[in-house]
Amino acid sequence: MLKVIVETKTLVQALGFASSVVEKRNIISELANIKLLAKDGLLELSSTNMDLYLSQKIGVQVVSEGELTVSTKTLNDIVKKLPDSELTLTDLGTTGLEITGKNCRFNLFTLPVESFPVMDNINPEASFKISCAEFAKIIESTKFSVSLDETRYNLNGIYLHVKDSEFYAASTDGHRLSVSSVVLAEKIEDFGVILPQKSAEEILKIVKDSKNANADIEILLSSNKIKFICNENVIMLSKLIDGTFPDYSSFIPENSSSKLVINRKIFADTIERIAIITVEKFRAVKLSLSGEALEISAIGEARGNAKEVINSSKETENFYEYSGETNLDIGFNPQYLEDVLKAIKSDLVELYFSSVSAPVLIKFPESPKDIFVVMPVKV
């Protein structure tokens, strides 16, 4: 029966990833559990919510091989509260899983392994590799504009697609659009799938982990599932959203009459300050643009009003340059602008306007593979 010796910090990290996958409220007890399998010097931890399946292998000292399932939450809550030391996990059969560490012992109830779901096989129609860093970047650049409206289920995820050997991620909630891409090293056939938001968030945590910083992630696709393999020891299988993502290329403005170039950080910080005065019912800030200065203002019902001016400057740390329509006044939901400005760490940001009611194109000179579109609001 299972008996392993493992470093607490190693187990804590793996349980953290596993806990994120497991639903907080499970009426099916098996889905609230994590499966532990000790074999060949590794401890495999498997967790699932039936839409998403995560398998992780960590290095341990295997005293004896075996497998069991135990409450994910209980095991995680215990282990993360223990000091950094070695732990011994021992399957005691009918009396459960024993956890022993420095001056402590816990005994947890277990369930039969036979009742735990098995990860489905996938017959990939396409597969390719990309660096974890590049994959993390395109997901982070698009995850914030996924629609939360469940009636628009085809927008409840990130559209991953390949066109002419360039890998794209795109998302929209109908008010804004985010697109990010990276050129693939290998040539593959065009495809398109919609990755659920939950799955995108979970795989992002894994690829951003420091031990995967210089690793590649392999992506395998079928018509209804996607499989991620990271560093060989982490496998995530996810169902895909069964729907058609809109042709977003028609949403991207091609012509503009005015252009704003401004220091990204100053612009973001100013919007964040002015937005404090706004209220949830109607969140809007007004940009008043001219060649001399940018005025950002807002009026908040029952709160007051706010205004801040950014003057024209050619210095990088407070750069501001505007050309086009004289004295343009346009309104935005401040959160939409803040999300874009936080997604890309660039010195400058460019905004392209065609009218006060038309979508605005946002680009970053230092990150040309990222494109954002935001709809204005009336102010």
UniProtKB/Swiss-Prot annotation:
GO terms for cellular component: cytoplasm; DNA polymerase III complex. Coiled coil: none annotated. Its main location: cytoplasm. One of its GO terms (biological process) is DNA strand elongation involved in DNA replication. One of its GO terms (molecular function) is 3'-5' exonuclease activity. It holds the Pfam family DNA_pol3_beta. Keywords: Cytoplasm, DNA replication, DNA-binding, DNA-directed DNA polymerase, Nucleotidyltransferase, Transferase. CDD domains: beta_clamp. It is found in: Cytoplasm. Belongs to the beta sliding clamp family. Forms a ring-shaped head-to-tail homodimer around DNA which binds and tethers DNA polymerases and other proteins to the DNA. The DNA replisome complex has a single clamp-loading complex (3 tau and 1 each of delta, delta', psi and chi subunits) which binds 3 Pol III cores (1 core on the leading strand and 2 on the lagging strand) each with a beta sliding clamp dimer. Additional proteins in the replisome are other copies of gamma, psi and chi, Ssb, DNA helicase and RNA primase. Confers DNA tethering and processivity to DNA polymerases and other proteins. Acts as a clamp, forming a ring around DNA (a reaction catalyzed by the clamp-loading complex) which diffuses in an ATP-independent manner freely and bidirectionally along dsDNA. Initially characterized for its ability to contact the catalytic subunit of DNA polymerase III (Pol III), a complex, multichain enzyme responsible for most of the replicative synthesis in bacteria; Pol III exhibits 3'-5' exonuclease proofreading activity. This is Beta sliding clamp. It comes from Rickettsia bellii (strain RML369-C). The gene is dnaN.
